[in-house]
């Protein structure tokens, strides 16, 4: 939860610096990170803090090469467990009985689109207006 709060505070602090270049993109990146951390913390609480609810699980291979029914966390390049994405987190939270408003989901989706464009290529139009509309 602390990381989520710190990420959002950083996003707001950077966004409020008028001469900070790339501030809208940085805001989108940090804001999405904040929402994802917050929602993952909420899901963990709903699941009695069982970490496997956040991990992408894969079957363990038997010695003969067949897949076992037992599963283990899939590891990333840094050998850390891979976690599910924000959309899967939202789905699991709702499956646990918590309703997330369509407005919130739409706002998060819009932030993700801005973040993805900032990270993977560029935003063709000014995103400051779109970010202000999300606020």
Per-region residue spans from a language model:
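Charged alpha-helical initiation segments
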Residues: 1-33, 42-48, 52-53
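Short, charged/polar, low-complexity loop and linker segments
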Residues: 12-16, 89-96, 116-121
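Charge-rich, low-complexity amphipathic helices
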Residues: 26, 33, 49, 56-64, ...
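Short, solvent-exposed secondary-structure capping/transition elements
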Residues: 39-52, 120, 124-131
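Flexible secondary-structure boundary motifs
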Residues: 56-103, 113-114
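Charge-enriched, short contiguous segments at helix-coil
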Residues: 96-135
């Amino acid at each position: 939860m602390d990381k989520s709060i710190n990420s959002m505070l950083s996003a707001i602090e950077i966004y409020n610096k008028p001469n900070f270049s790339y501030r809208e993109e940085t805001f989108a990146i940090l804001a999405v990170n904040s929402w994802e951390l917050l929602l993952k913390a909420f899901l963990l609480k709903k699941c009695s803090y069982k970490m496997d609810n956040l991990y992408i699980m894969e079957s363990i291979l038997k010695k003969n090469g067949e897949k076992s029914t037992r599963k283990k966390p899939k590891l990333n390049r840094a050998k850390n467990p891979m976690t599910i994405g924000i959309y899967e987190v939202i789905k699991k939270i709702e499956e646990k009985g918590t309703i997330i408003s369509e407005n919130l989901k739409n706002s998060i989706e819009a932030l993700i689109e801005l973040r993805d464009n900032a990270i993977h290529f560029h935003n063709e139009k000014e995103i400051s207006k779109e970010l202000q509309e999300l606020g």
